[in-house]
Amino acid sequence: MARTAPVEPPLRHSAPPSPAAGEPRTSVEAAVAPRRVLFADEALGLPLAQLRRYRPWGGPGAGKMAAAAGQDGGGGGGADEDDDGEDGDEGEEEEEACPEPSPLCPVPAGGGFYLVPTFSLPPAPGRLERLGRVMVELEALLPPPGAVPGGAGVWVPGGRPPVLRGLVRVLNRSFEKAVHVRASHDGWASFCDHPARYVPRSPPWAGAGGTGAGDPILDPGLGLGPGQASASSPDDGGRTDRFAFQLPFAEGAGDGARLDFVVRYETPEGTFWANNHGRNYTVLLRIAPAPTPTDAEGLPQQQQLPQLEPQPECQGPVEAEARQLKSCMKPVRRRPAEEELKTKNMDDNTFAMAEHPDVQESVGPLVAPTPLRPWPQMTLQVSDVPMTGNPAEEGDVPRSSPPVAFTEVLQAPAIRIPPSSPLCGLGGSPRDQASGPDASEGATGPFLEPSQQQAEATWGVSSENGGGLEAVSGSEELLGEDTIDQELEQLYLSHLSRLRAAVAAGGAGGGGEGSTDGGMSPSHPLGILTDRDLILKWPGPERALNSALAEEITLHYARLGRGVELIKDTEDPDDEGEGEEGLSVTPSSPEGDSPKESPPEILSGARSVVATMGDVWLPWAEGSGCDGPVVLGTEGQFIGDPEKGMGKDTSSLHMNRVIAGVTESLGEAGTEAQIEVTSEWAGSLDPISGKEPASPVLLQGQNPTLLSPLGAEVCLSSVARPHVSSQDEKDAGPSLEPPKKSPTLAVPAECVCALPPQLRGPLTQTLGVLAGLVVVPVALNSGVSLLVLALCLSLAWFS
């Protein structure tokens, strides 16, 4: 059950006591008779109203206003004096903070004055951004009231006190704000704070009886005409406010009087100052007589300059603009000697004409500037910079490097480099890989044309170079090497073509039936390299062709002296998995991409049978006999299982260089001999892709012959047998023993053909020329392998 609030009894007002019944009527009427009102002006002689004016600061005129208020209220009662006692004390405190200045002394009527500021006002553009940082800024200085604009600036006639007026722009951070201007006339020995009045956004005289009508500060004498307030203060959406101030000069101020002031802006957030970046604002007073009519009409700019120089700072933006327009209306007459300065002043005149096009007619025609003549062509010398490198290092040009002139550089020569193949890293048959210009294009396979990457690699200079001179020397070295390579290539090819033509002419007459066995197996025993191997072994594509040609020429002459037939060097990549039990070659570097190995050594005294680029007949040494022909065959002619008892190792690299089918009549009938020669190269590298070169084997026969594909017979006088394994006739398959580094390989052969005397002289000269041709590129390219090979050849031939 809800409780109800207690009900208060209604208030009862006691009725006025009624007159006693026995009381007479006349006494009651006398008690309620009306009162009479007495006014102070009638009874006491005081004014009916008392007016007091209060100022929150002790500025100029405060003493006069206080004196007037004292005269008005001098006869007031004690109550009024008590009521106004606090206000009087506050006024006295304010007057103590800012002592009352003496009455202003106007300038004599016969003269006038100018106000000359010693500072420059900040420009209007970017004012809002600056206010965001400093909060308060002095916007403009306004002319004093009664100023007369003349040719020499704004002049104030005599009879008026010198005062300074200005506008302050503040950032509107809060509604409650106060702006004061602290001024000093004696170099800050004493100062006084003057309040600044808020300037509304609309002109105060917009309507009749406006807010600012009659105001001593915001009257038309302030210098802001109709529309000028909005012109000098563009609308910024209420983000800023303007305040106006007026500063008087000291009593008896004469010519050269000084007025220093700063602006203080007080907000609830804090107090901000504008003091001209710590230098304070200073305005000087200049007493000057009234301007003459000539001055009013306008004088030449040179004579007006001393007086007009500080005047734009003393005026607002609008007044300064109007004065500039008038000066533009009367152009300056220049003498012929001043024609040189027209080019410099042309920009200023163009800016003035573009801003005020109506002035162009009065200015007159402008003299067109003289067109600039182009400079004569000259050779510019620029310090060279590295061609390749980091972008941060490209601009760093060493000052110590002498300037060099740019010259046209020929393109790097195109060198045909066969691409890598699965078998040996080269495309096409070995016959056509380094056979020179007479090679057929159809059998060579694809070649790599010089691409942009190769050209960049040719011209690329490492960023590790110390300066521009090293880059220049590197490019010159590359150019010299390429030129030498081209010359060597042409020399090698021409010499080799003559040798081949001679060999082909010699072998054309001794033709026979060709072999039907197909291509011959590659073989080069005793470490002698073919052109294909030279290209593979050489660590750099730009030297491969020349090295192969040089080696072919060297081996050609070597075979001439040793009396060894040329064996066709071809490979049958279709025979897969045959002869994999040959010599296992371990790569010299873990990468295996660009092996850099020294050339194999040539064993003197051993019989060398080398594969070449074709079927060539060579004359044998004198006195050499031939027991019987020797026939070359392929492994496809074996009888039996070629892989019997042979283990395959696909993870290792193999190269079989077996010379088989070379037999000799040993004097015993029915005797079979099989010669197996294996050449082991230290560090040689041939990639294996599932296809091994066919291993040649021995063909049986009493009088075997060597049949070339063209049907030519080769007669061997005596063949060395460094490593021979005999087999019985019952064994049909070949017996391939593991390759061993047998010392018997270096044993001299049974019959070594001596070099004919008629060939020793030409051969010595040829080897000397070839040695010089080989040493030059080796010295340029630092090829140690070719140098070692040349030394080995020299030792082999002349030992």
From Swiss-Prot:
It is found in: Membrane. It is a single-pass membrane protein. The chain crosses the membrane at residues 769-789. Residues 79-98, 571-581 have a biased composition (Acidic residues). Expressed in brain, skeletal muscle and heart. Residues 1-28, 53-104, 205-241, 420-471, 569-602, 723-742 are annotated as: Disordered. Keywords: Membrane, Phosphoprotein, Transmembrane, Transmembrane helix. A motif (PP1-binding motif) lies at residues 36-39. One of its GO terms (biological process) is regulation of glycogen biosynthetic process. InterPro entries: CBM21_dom, CBM21_dom_sf, PP1_regulatory_subunit_3. The keyword Cytoplasm does not apply. One of its GO terms (cellular component) is membrane. Residues 790-799 are extracellular. Residues 128-284 form the CBM21 domain. Signal peptide: none annotated. It comes from the Eukaryota. The keyword rRNA-binding does not apply. This is Protein phosphatase 1 regulatory subunit 3F.
